[in-house]
Each structure stands twice: as structure tokens, then as C-alpha cells.
Amino acid sequence: MQRNRWGRWFAGVAVISLVVIGCAKSSGATTPPAASTGAASSGPAASGGAAPAGSATAAAATCKGDGSKGEVKLMINQWVGAAANVAVAQCLLQQMGYKVTTSTLAEEVAWQGFQTGEVDVILENWGHPDLEKKYIQTDKLAQDAGPNGVTGIIGWYVPGWMIDKYPDLADWHNLNKYADLFKTSESGDKGQFLGSDPTFVQYDEALIANLHLNFKDVFSGSEAATITAFQQADKNKTALIGYFYDPQWLQSEIKLVQIHLPAYTPGCDADLKKVACDYPPYVLNKIVRTKWLDGAGDAGTFVKNFKWANADQNSVADAITNKNMSPEDAAKQWIDANPTKWAAWMP
């Protein structure tokens, strides 16, 4: 965040703060284990059918519970899709009788919470092999709790109007040809490549260097600031290239086109200093604290079973971002509309 010098950063912090407050409304956010350094097209999720019987209430009239079954500490990643995951899980866990507390943390910082006991569950992990090796394989402090059902795509994107005007821009070989279009006061005599939150999974600086591109990586500082930049570039027909991903509700609001980088092959990103290939597709998974899982009971079973599709996450994220709904209300709306989906998560 500290590297960002854009005025839009302040708006991004405000958006993220609202998401945090909404998600923590029922039980309050926990103190972070360390100082923090700071989701596909949206649409209605498929309706389920008759409300099932189960450990949670049949309808989400309220997300309240008595907290008698113990505490679950959920981590919220710094993007709205992750807030959608937590909002739905929090509501259902509270209905099951658990007290749920939440923390909003940078990805790497969150893993430290497995050691301190301040984080029990990460519901969306975007591939951190170094952290997985340390906390899962070596220290045995955490475990893989299976996929969350969402497939993540990271890449380089430009507004659709640019491809309409410059069709060959979609091929990375031609990026230097158009570098001057992307120059800003931040990038000097090079084209600007807009990075996002510096804590996200990314190796754009290495890609730029290893592909010999005349660009400079400039961080926006947050997801919210990146979204604003793409919205303005689409509206004002200004040039922009940057790091973005799917699932993310913005993909349905404006046309974004992914740049064709050298194709990903297994192992091409083994040395991130030498990487010269596209990002891999990510089968997003859940990570849980081992000591918590050992005594988690029904909550542990629920977390292992938690699995929904990109469209489900997008519908909740869209409601939070574009329909002025609190995370809790957006979660209740999805829960009411999809009883057969969340029933499959119940012990």
C-alpha cells in the first residue's frame, strides 16, 4: 500500500473498510496477528428449491446464534469475492451455534495467524507454495481443507475498446509497439503497467523484465483502486493495461480482454525471477489451522464441505458492491435462494 501514490487509494480503503465492518457486524473483528499491509461475471445464483432441514435454520431470516458451540476465526482476504465467502460461511456458522470472529489481513500475514492461533480458517487461497511448504508440510500448523469450488484466473487485461481499435495488442509480442500509449507521470519514459495490491500473488515485474517489455509496474494499492482505474479507462477511452483476475464482478460490467502471454506450462514459474510465462489457472482451496480442526467438530465438517461456484460468489460480491447491501444481507439473500446448495455443507 505504501508504494501507491494515487488519490484513488483513499476511496479503495473506504470500500474495503465498509466490507470489513459489514462482515464483522455480528461479532466484531479480531485483532490481526501482525500489522496488515493495508472475484467472473456477476449474476443471480441458481435457485435451489424447498428449504431442507439441517443444523442451520431453514431460512436466513437472521444470522444470529447463541455461540454456545465455540468460536471460529475466519480470515477475510482483501478483495470482495473473499468477503462474499466469509459472509455466507459466517451467517451459516452462527446459525449452527458458533461465535464467528473475522480479521481482514494481507495474504501472507494471515498465515502467521495459524501459529499464534488468531486465524482458524482461510476460505480462499490463491496458491502460495512457499507458505504451504512452511505451515503445512514443515511446521504442520495448517492443513489443506479442499477446494472451495472457485477457479481463479490471473492475467494482464486491457479495456475492450483498445482491442477493437488495436486488434494486435492482444498479443504480447506487440506490447512494445504500443508502449507510448500507456505512458504516465508515474512510469516516465516507459508504458505504465498497473499492478494491484502489492500483497497479491503476482510476478509482473519479472515478466516485464524477462519478456523485454518497455513498461514499468506501478501499483494501484488495492482492488478498489484497480477497479476504478479500469472503469475510468473504459468510460473515457484512455489506455490502460494491468493485472486483473476472474472471478470478479467487474468482468460483467465492462468488457476486459486478456493479453495472450506465453502459455503457462507446469514448472515455467518455478523460478519467479526468471519467469516468462502466463499465470496458471488456480483451483482455489481452503486452509485451516490444524489444532483448531482437531477439535472443531461440526464447524470443521462445514468448512471442509464449503464449496460453491464462481457464479455464486459473484452474486454475493455484486450485491455487496453494486446493490448497497451489507455483507450479512447479501449472504442472507443468497442463502434464502439456494437452500439445497448450502444444505450439502451441513454435517
For every predicted segment, state its role:
Residues L141-F193:
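A conserved helix-loop-strand patch within extracytoplasmic ligand-binding domains
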Residues N77-V80, Y98-G113, V218-A229:
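Short helix-initiation/N-cap motifs at beta->coil->alpha
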Residues I154-K165, P281-G295, D318-A319:
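A bilobed periplasmic-binding-protein/Venus flytrap-type ligand-binding module shared by bacterial periplasmic
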Residues C23-P32, A40, A46:
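Bacterial lipoprotein signal-peptidase II cleavage site
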Residues G65, V86, L105-L141, I227-Q231, ...:
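Pocket-flanking alpha-helical
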Residues V119-L123, Q192-C268:
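Ligand-binding pocket segment of bilobal, Venus flytrap-like solute-binding proteins
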Residues A56-A87, A106-E108:
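Extracytoplasmic "Venus flytrap"
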Residues G67-G81, Y98-S103, K190-L194, V303:
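Short, well-ordered beta-strand elements
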